[in-house]
Amino acid sequence: MVSLTDLFLASLLVPTSPWLCLPPRIDTIDQRGGRVTLKQVRNPRGHKAFNPARATYRTFLKYGVPAPDYIKKAVAHIDEEQEEAFARIKRDTGSAAAIPINEVDIAYVTPVTIGTPPQTLMLDLDTGSSDLWVFSSLTPSNQVRGQEIYSPTKSSTSKLLSGHTWSIRYGDGSGSRGTVYTDNFTIGGLEVKSQAVQAALEVSSMLTQEQSLDGLVGLGFSALNTVRPSSQLTFFDNARPNLDEEVFTADLKYHATGSYDFGFIDSKKYAGNITYTAVQQSPGYWTHSLSGYSVGSGAFQASQISGISDTGTTLLYLPTAIVTAYYRQVQGAQNSQYYGGYVFPCSSTLPTFTFGIEGARFTIPASYINYTRISPTSTTCYGGLQSSSGLGINIFGDVALKRAFVVFSGTNPPRIGFAIKPLAS
């Protein structure tokens, strides 16, 4: 199996554009004006509760890094506390309870259709990976837990990509793998014909537990695609030549449905100018640098902080020194191995956190960082800002990306842009 870390390291040895040495683009696309807006929807199959330690555990595994033992134990501790809280509430009130799923913004997904006739699945658009994979009719039934599946045999336009397979290894040694088909793939009216669709033969238990997700649409660079013997182009790379502009944008929201735009930049979604910064091409991720940070009303600390803008990662992971400086200003905050990260009394007042993109500044509201309660009855909250120690890379996840209107530009060389936008109340 190939891990994302293996691909990251190997790609550092290749000082070329991320689009070289890849198969030709598909040129049969229904562009419908060359632009499309994709609105997220709230998936009714969301979990009854969100385990924040599991979010950190998944981030380690996603990037091919073994998670520390204390994080594994923290997942179990929080699961146990949540189940005890649910049982206690049901016993006391006679009805089940849950942390409202929209409190943690994990149930928002994008509907797509695959094949002829179209099969609808709910997928996550993920700038931190480059595989378009789905639960399928080939996935063992004991690895499917409520997900919708893609059945290639029910599509008249599906074709097996003979001899091609895909395989991803995660940091705990588990993995997902499968076979590859080409089929019509449509998001929001934008159709790519003969898009590579990676049908799962095996899915890790981590992904089986994600009942709200039927798979991923990777929007990283195609150089990171794990199909072998020949890497396949991502949906965006297949669509790029037929879009009005070679861009897609992310307008993620706090406790609300966000949207993605392909092929254009909607000026109504942001204010002022878009500040662009260079993408470090060789890794294949949307890797770039922040220009510094500040905590609350403190002075801005100029510092180059390299990391990945990843819409598929929930939290914001930064160097330990920065995270420590932040939580030093939160009464009662502690770096808890029991809970797998920084926690604090839910009643504590949190400061804002500001990050820089070149000369522009973006302030994350304190409410975004007061991420979630440990359980429905807990008075302890988990922070949306956590240390990247052990990961080997900083991750600018949704907690940060919700603060800005973000432009992913597929120009050569690629670049990423951030703009101020109105925030949800």
From Swiss-Prot:
Gene3D superfamilies: Acid Proteases (2.40.70.10). GO terms for biological process: proteolysis. Residues 29-91 form a propeptide. Its EC number is 3.4.23.-. The active site is at D126, D310. Residues 108-419 form the Peptidase A1 domain. Disulfide bonds join C346-C381. The keyword Hydrolase applies. Glycans are attached at N184, N273, N370. SUPFAM superfamilies: Acid proteases. Induction: Expressed under carbon starvation conditions. GO terms for molecular function: aspartic-type endopeptidase activity. Keywords: Aspartyl protease, Cleavage on pair of basic residues, Disulfide bond, Glycoprotein, Hydrolase, Protease, Signal, Zymogen. It comes from the Eukaryota. Residues 1-28 form the signal peptide. Belongs to the peptidase A1 family. This is Podosporapepsin. The gene is PAPA.
